[in-house]
A protein has these predicted regions:
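Single conserved hydrophobic/aromatic residue that forms the stacking wall/gate
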Residues: 1-14
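A contiguous loop/helix-start segment that scaffolds small-molecule binding in enzyme catalytic cores
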Residues: 5, 80-81, 159-230
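Short glycine-rich anion-binding loops that position phosphate/pyrophosphate groups of nucleotides
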Residues: 10-11, 87-91, 171-172
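A short beta-strand/loop micro-motif in the catalytic core of glycosyltransferases
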Residues: 29-35
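General beta-strand structural signal in soluble alpha/beta enzymes
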Residues: 33, 86, 111-116, 167, ...
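Conserved helicase motor
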Residues: 58-65, 140-144
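Glycine/small-residue-rich loop that forms an oxyanion/phosphate-binding "nest" at active or ligand-binding sites
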Residues: 61-64, 68-111
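Class I SAM-dependent methyltransferase SAM-binding "motif I" and its flanking Rossmann-like core
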Residues: 95, 99-157
Length: 230
């Protein structure tokens, strides 16, 4: 039995996916997806000739229960391949999908992760920061006081543990995030801003907090990942 996780975001660039992935995807007719509409659009980008109406999609969101997932996996248990597609990243890596894989593993079903772009890995690669030890924290608190406290805590971990710290923000709050980082971190602390990774207009730049002052591009409408190191 095989369960294939696409390990690619449905809104990311098709050029970054190996041709092997296409072969696998075209052999799958059951998909567990974060968003049905964008998953259908993604599959059409993979192959324009694909007959979407012959495919079955199962929604994966915060309302999906373990019982739902077990039901979704019935085709897999019957010997068919299934795929997991998340919105903009790698399924099960800082993205939905881990619960599906956990249940598949419990049922002794084969899980095959496919190679694809991960903004976490690619941003570490492009930052010049420690790639041996790094931690991804997702979204930081929205409340200003809590956010400032969290940023300072992450900066302390950089110096105490020599560990790269990564986090993200909703695009329309990106500019405010950079502002908060520059206000709360030491001048010598390094900040890498990685935006639009693998897509047109890709931007990956590392500078000290002091060097970033007054020189930050507008990040308000693009996906970004922020990295701190020393």
């Amino acid at each position: 039995y095989e369960m294939t996780s696409s390990l690619v975001g449905s809104e990311m660039c098709i050029r970054d996916r190996p041709s092997y992935n296409k072969e696998i995807i075209l052999g799958i007719s059951h998909f567990i997806v974060e968003d049905v509409r964008s998953a259908r659009r993604f599959l059409k980008k993979v192959d324009r000739e694909i007959d979407i109406d012959t495919l079955t999609f199962y929604p994966l969101n915060k309302h999906t229960s373990p019982e739902d997932i077990s039901g979704y996996l019935k085709p897999l248990m019957a010997g068919l391949s299934m795929g997991v597609i998340s919105e903009a990243g790698c399924p099960a890596v800082a993205d939905p999908g881990a619960d599906v894989v956990a249940i598949a593993q419990r049922k002794n079903l084969k899980v095959v992760p496919l190679v694809g772009p991960s903004s976490i890995i690619l941003s570490v690669m492009g930052s010049g920061f420690n790639g041996q030890s790094f931690a991804f924290h997702g979204y930081l608190p929205i409340e200003p006081g809590e956010r400032a406290k969290k940023i300072r805590t992450l900066e302390q971990r950089v110096y105490a543990e020599h560990q790269t710290q990564l986090f993200i923000e909703t695009p329309y709050r990106n500019n405010k995030m950079v502002e908060d980082i520059l206000q709360n971190c030491r001048p010598q602390t390094k900040l890498c801003i990685a935006a639009n990774i693998t897509c047109e207009g890709e931007y990956i730049k590392t500078k000290t907090v002091k060097e970033w002052q007054g020189k930050v591009p507008d990040l308000s409408k693009i996906p970004c990942i922020f990295l701190l190191y020393k």
